[in-house]
């Protein structure tokens, strides 16, 4: 095991501070409508230009190992805040730097770091409680648009599109963000349930121009296994032909004589039919087939039920008003399933989402929930250049996450006003000694987001903070218009969840940094001088 180097006490804490300050300086310049861009060098391709705090933070690696530890810990504040709330990464970084910097001054002056941390934690609890009390529930499309606009760095077009998307698919619907092939940013809403499987054979196509098969008022056969034997399928096909309605077959696969018969009957016009492979794999496939069965009012024919294909009745089939099958996607619109059964399935999936510990499983469950509950909206982000496209897509994703957070926990006045108004909660605490000093550190830190917003706009931050403190309620400073306004009326709002998460994460890491007493890292290897090549000696008389 290689030898390690250690540093202790003040040396350790000040090394951490240098790293925290360097990271914070790079990140906090992006805060607010007057925030600046940061250019990130990439080993391949053109540099990335961004105003997204967490994107900047993730790129920072410092040469000094002690300083780098501080930077990496604050980077975690930004990443965790982004993961949980989708935004507020820059605010979290500013708060972490402020709490640690002020706390370190007091530790250096002789305060007990453990008592300071307890004071910080108690102050944060009081502020979080106050934030929830001043929070407003998001009502209507206009307020959703305001939140999205603020989170997208004041881009009203992005705010409008996100508000439209959430309005159309509802709070349980899925909104995905994709890169467009043109320069405009557009919204596409997929009605009904869509899954990523297309027709097995192109002979099933009914619309040659669009290369799609459209089935109106169709029956749906949902089968877990492969269908290859015609004998098993024939009784059902005869019943379908008598009923005179189209049929969609969803199975693991359709092959051999079964597929040939379906194609021949489709081409002759005897039967309007289309076959697609079942979506997903393994247990997830079975769950998705059950979802389709419940949505369409049919039965999923699995081995567990013991129903043979030749014994299937028309009552066992699902039904839908319209089905569109493309080369790679199938969309089922207006399934005939019972509303109560669909709601029961939705509640079951919600419980699974709460219980799961896997991010991947949670994402897949949320997709299933969206397909059953509200549908799927796709925002196609367009831009003139690839560099702009990357930056814009990151802003859209941030704004979308923040908007969902706002719908979840409500909104508070933006522009740093909510945190400033929560100073009253700390004034109401009765603490003693170093715990009171810890609470005072948080009290002062709550001014920093507003101060940074004003500093980025080229104004005197301390003056703006004092002006806003003298005002009441939701009144604050509109940095873009350089005037004092009611933040709610001006549409300058932040999701409560974003503000809460930023403060909690910042205080958590700052508290850990304050109570650090020693640091350990590997000794950097010294570069070895290259060995003299063999036979290089004795060449002194040679001329060059």
From Swiss-Prot:
Chain residues that bind ATP: 30-33, 51, 87-91, 415, 478-480, 494
GO CC annotations, alphabetized: cytoplasm
Composition bias, Gly residues: 535-544
EC number: 5.6.1.7
Keyword Cytoplasm: yes
Oxidoreductase in keyword set: no
Record Gene3D superfamilies: GroEL, GroEL-like equatorial domain, TCP-1-like chaperonin intermediate domain
GO molecular function, one term: ATP-dependent protein folding chaperone
Keywords: ATP-binding, Chaperone, Cytoplasm, Isomerase, Nucleotide-binding
Catalytic activity: ATP + H2O + a folded polypeptide = ADP + phosphate + an unfolded polypeptide
Any Pfam family matching the protein: Cpn60_TCP1
Biological processes annotated in GO: protein refolding
Disordered as annotated region, ranges: 524-544
Record family assignment: Belongs to the chaperonin (HSP60) family.
NCBIfam families in alphabetical order: GroEL, PRK00013.1, PRK12849.1, PRK12850.1, PRK12851.1
Described purpose of this protein according to its UniProt entry: Together with its co-chaperonin GroES, plays an essential role in assisting protein folding. The GroEL-GroES system forms a nano-cage that allows encapsulation of the non-native substrate proteins and provides a physical environment optimized to promote and accelerate protein folding.
Subunit structure: Forms a cylinder of 14 subunits composed of two heptameric rings stacked back-to-back. Interacts with the co-chaperonin GroES.
Name this protein carries in UniProt: Chaperonin GroEL
Annotated organism of origin: Methylacidiphilum infernorum (isolate V4) (Methylokorus infernorum (strain V4))
Encoding gene (name): groEL
């Amino acid at each position: 095991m290689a030898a390690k180097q250690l540093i202790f006490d003040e040396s350790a804490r000040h090394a951490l501070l240098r790293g925290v300050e360097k990271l914070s300086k790079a990140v906090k310049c992006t805060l607010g409508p007057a925030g600046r861009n940061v250019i990130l060098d990439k080993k391949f391709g053109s540099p990335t230009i961004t105003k997204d705090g967490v994107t900047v933070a993730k790129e920072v690696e410092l040469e000094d190992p002690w300083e780098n530890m501080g930077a990496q810990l604050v980077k975690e504040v930004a990443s965790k805040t982004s993961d949980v709330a989708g935004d507020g990464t820059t605010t979290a970084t500013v708060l972490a730097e402020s709490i640690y910097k002020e706390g370190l001054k007091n530790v250096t002056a002789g305060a007990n770091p453990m008592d300071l941390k307890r004071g910080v934690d108690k102050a944060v609890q009081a502020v979080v409680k106050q934030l929830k009390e001043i929070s407003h529930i998001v009502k209507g499309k206009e307020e959703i648009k305001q939140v999205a606009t603020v989170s997208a760095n004041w881009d009203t077009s992005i705010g409008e599109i996100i508000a439209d998307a959430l309005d159309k698919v509802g709070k349980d619907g899925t909104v995905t963000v994709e890169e467009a092939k043109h320069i405009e940013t557009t919204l596409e809403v997929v009605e009904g349930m869509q899954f990523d499987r297309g027709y097995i054979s192109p002979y099933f196509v009914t619309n040659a121009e669009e290369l799609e098969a459209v089935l109106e008022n169709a029956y749906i056969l949902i089968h877990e296994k492969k269908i290859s034997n015609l004998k098993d399928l024939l009784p059902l096909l005869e019943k379908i032909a008598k009923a005179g309605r189209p049929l969609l077959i969803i199975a693991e696969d359709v092959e051999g004589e079964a597929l040939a018969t379906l194609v021949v009957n489709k081409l002759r016009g005897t039967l309007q039919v289309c076959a697609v492979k079942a979506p997903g794999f393994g247990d997830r496939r079975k769950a998705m087939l059950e979802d389709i069965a419940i949505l369409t009012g049919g039965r999923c024919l699995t081995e567990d039920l013991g129903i043979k294909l030749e014994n299937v009745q028309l009552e066992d089939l699902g039904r839908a008003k319209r089905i569109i099958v493309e080369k790679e996607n199938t969309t089922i619109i207006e399934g005939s399933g019972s509303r109560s059964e669909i709601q029961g399935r939705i509640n079951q999936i919600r419980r699974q989402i709460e219980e799961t510990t896997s991010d991947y499983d949670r994402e897949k469950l949320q997709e299933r929930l969206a397909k059953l509950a509200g549908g799927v909206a796709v925002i196609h982000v367009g831009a003139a250049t690839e560099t702009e496209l990357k930056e814009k897509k990151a802003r859209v994703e941030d704004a979308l996450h923040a908007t969902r957070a706002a719908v979840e926990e409500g909104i508070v006045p933006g522009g740093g006003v909510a945190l400033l108004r929560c100073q009253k909660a700390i004034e109401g605490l009765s603490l003693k000694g170093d715990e009171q000093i810890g609470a005072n550190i948080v009290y002062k830190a709550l001014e920093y987001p507003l101060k940074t917003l004003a500093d980025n706009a080229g104004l005197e931050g301390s003056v703006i903070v004092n002006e806003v403190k003298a005002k009441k309620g939701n009144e604050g400073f509109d940095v873009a218009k350089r005037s004092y306004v009611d933040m709610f009326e001006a549409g300058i709002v932040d999701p409560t969840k974003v503000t809460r998460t930023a403060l909690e994460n910042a205080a958590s890491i700052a508290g850990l940094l304050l109570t650090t007493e020693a640091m350990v890292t590997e000794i950097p290897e010294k570069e070895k001088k290259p060995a003299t090549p063999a036979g290089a000696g004795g060449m002194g008389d040679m001329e060059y």
